[in-house]
Amino acid sequence: MNIIGIRSSPTKIFFSIVTIEEESFSFINQELLIPVSFDTPQKLKYVRKTMLDIFNEYNIIKAGIRVTEPSADANDFRIMLEGIIQELIASSKAEIYFTGVKASIGSKLGIPNDGTISEVMDGNQPFNEIPDWKELSKEYRECLMVAFAALNLN
């Protein structure tokens, strides 16, 4: 089974594809650069089409999206990207997905929201016995965590 965890930024989409086999897993981390020369509608179309191709190529069954924490400083374009990604998931063959902020991701993973989830996301505590967890970028740590949170969906 293939699961994807996604985290967007205004300039790129980070994603981790996790393959679950029996009692083990493997993963790849990738990023999709958003062309700066495109205007906003073209950027959204590019992300939707390219990510849908990735979903189809890897036969993604479950997906998780790390969404922007609610705040007055939220980046409007990142929120648009998160919306277009949710729409493309609805158009894909994925059976189930979820969107999560830090607390809801922690809840799905059984990690308390008492500062522990932040410690794990920041790489200060291990996660799922993933080697070199601290060496991964925070964006990829979030992608992997949201992918494993999606794994727990029914």
Please place each PLM-identified region on the residue numbering.
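Phosphate- and other anionic-substrate recognition elements at nucleic-acid/protein interfaces
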Residues: N2-I3, S9-N154
